[in-house]
Amino acid sequence: MRKLDLEYKIIGEGRGVLVIETGIGGSFYDWYPIVEKLKEHFTIVLYHRAGYGKSQNPSTPRTTKNIANELNCLLEAIGIKEKFILMGHSFGGLCVQQYAKMYPHKLKSIVLLDSTSFNFKSLYMLDIPVMKEFIAINKMVESNINSSKKSKEELKKQNQNIISAYNNRISEEDMVAVEEFFTSHMLHKTIAQEFENWDTDSKDIKDMREFPQIPLIVVARDIDLAIKEWIDYDIPEKEAVLYENQWRRLQRELSEVSEKSKFIIAQGSGHEVYLDRPDLIINSLNIIIS
């Protein structure tokens, strides 16, 4: 794959290379505030997966296997030769798990930020009927397919809260790119395709070789805060507690795949740990390179 097929940015000139894999539907502009604080000590690679931003349209199914392969091609094309730290958030963390099993020799360490688990299906086996209507994979797929058919103006209105949250955080030029990002029909089509393949992704990751025994940091969200957020969305407290307890168990399970792991609870943070607790992530990364 030619390097210009995927949109990327290299920021900083620090001695450690840090590659960031964003969550599903997320842009790398989200990461600018924390990247500003990291660029003195790290060379940071941000990129948009195929179908996101200015990257090419997907040419293969949106599986974590294909995503990992495409990331590897990009890193080779831009000349990343030394071992690097790979950090992933949410679904991006699932992509990181896949990459780690496919290219273990290329990694210095891994950071998983409230990552989707390879055993995510256990969440759907819980007795949480109301929440299942809210988080069902088929609902996510259907919703994004519907969004992909809307006009740009309709998508701008639909995503106005997301877009406006970037105000005063990035430049005016980048604000134009953010609006383009979230009003893209291809973005929503790609998100639907990524969700569609979660079952395949889970099986692939579990069927592959053992996880590499390299330093691993797993950061999990604050259970009490997450439960409160679910209740604010009219999810019954009992269901929210069941779900969040299982999510925490899955995070701990992720930390057990390497004997060189550290498990951290991000007190006061919801799912977007990199926005809520950047200090915690910065400290964790500094431990890795010290």
Which residue stretches match the model-derived regions?
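Flexible "cap/lid" loop of the alpha/beta hydrolase fold
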Residues: 111-148
